[in-house]
Regions:
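C-terminal helical subdomain
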Residues: 163-164, 181-258
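Catalytic loop of short-chain dehydrogenase/reductase
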Residues: 109-157, 165-170, 176, 180-181
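The beta1-alpha1 cofactor-binding region of Rossmann-like NAD(H)/NADP(H)-dependent oxidoreductases
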Residues: 19-23, 40-52, 83
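Substrate-binding pocket helix/loop in short-chain dehydrogenase/reductase
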Residues: 77-78, 82-87
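Conserved glycine-rich Rossmann-like NAD(P)H-binding loop of the short-chain dehydrogenase/reductase
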Residues: 1-24
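A glycine-rich helix->loop->beta "capping" turn
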Residues: 32-37, 55-68, 74, 160
């Protein structure tokens, strides 16, 4: 399948702690057989987002899928959270998700199988997910509330709106920098599990599969995957649970044992 992707990022400058740039990501997509359009975009700017959406439509002829993955994170308590960090998390996570979805909507209506996918957690209202990280949890749950509301609002348009969240930590630079370095990476699954789960969701019938808060390994398990060792940084090793995964989430033996 040839993928045509618009990549949005605030800057083209390399980050001191995060590898690559929007342009190196585009090169990887092209090398894998896809087509990429890198666009510098501050997701907090209405003009920037509108322009990025218009560029995607002009370049590719339309929009079939909107993935809201942009997030800011700071895992601090109320006392230690500066208001500028609170504002940043809410501007990017909640407002950014809402705005990108809103501006993609007219174009998604024209697609044969339109999907919005937010990288956002289930709306599990347990106090343990809020205490100590109130600002961040509120910001991420705003993305989740977009799923809840937009799925219902867009249902008659045939536009699917779903959320995807990992059961465990994922081995990304952000996790390495914010959650504990190399040791956490050993307790994480690779990014491929989220990519594969996203593919399963985005290839479903948008009129039939919407309003779901999906967990990565459950999506893959239900699609037929029974061996998850290929996704582990250390096969059969201990995995660190991610935030926000409800205690009631099923854990089949095939997932538990690999």
């Amino acid at each position: 399948m040839v993928q045509r992707l618009l990549l949005q990022q605030k800057t083209a400058d390399p980050h001191p702690k995060l590898p690559g740039t929007i342009y190196t990501a585009a090169e990887e997509i092209v090398e894998a057989g896809g087509e990429a359009l890198p666009v510098i975009c501050d997701i907090r700017s209405e003009d920037n987002v509108r322009d990025a959406v218009n560029q995607a439509v002009d370049h590719f002829g339309g929009i079939d899928i909107c993935i809201n993955n942009a997030s800011a994170i700071q895992l601090t308590n109320v006392t230690d959270t500066e208001m500028k960090r609170y504002d940043l998390m809410h501007q990017i996570n909640g407002r950014g998700t809402y705005m990108v979805s809103k501006f993609c909507l007219p174009h998604l209506k024209k697609s044969d199988n339109p999907h919005i996918l937010n990288l956002a957690p289930p709306l599990d209202m347990e106090a343990k997910w809020f205490a100590g990280t109130v600002a961040y949890t509120m910001a991420k749950y705003t993305m989740s509330m977009c799923v809840l509301g937009m799925a219902e609002e867009f249902k008659d348009m045939g536009i699917a709106v779903n959320a995807l969240w990992p059961r465990t930590a994922i081995a990304t630079a952000a996790v390495q920098n914010h959650l504990g370095g190399d040791e956490i990476m050993k307790l994480s699954r690779t990014v491929e599990i989220m990519a594969d789960a996203s593919y399963e969701i985005l290839t479903k019938d948008s009129k039939e599969f919407t309003g779901n808060f999906c967990i990565d390994d459950i999506v893959l398990y239900e699609s037929g995957v029974k061996d998850f060792t290929k996704y582990a940084s250390v096969p059969f090793g201990e995995l660190m649970p991610d935030f926000f995964v409800p205690d009631s989430t099923p854990l089949p033996d095939e997932i538990k044992n690999s």
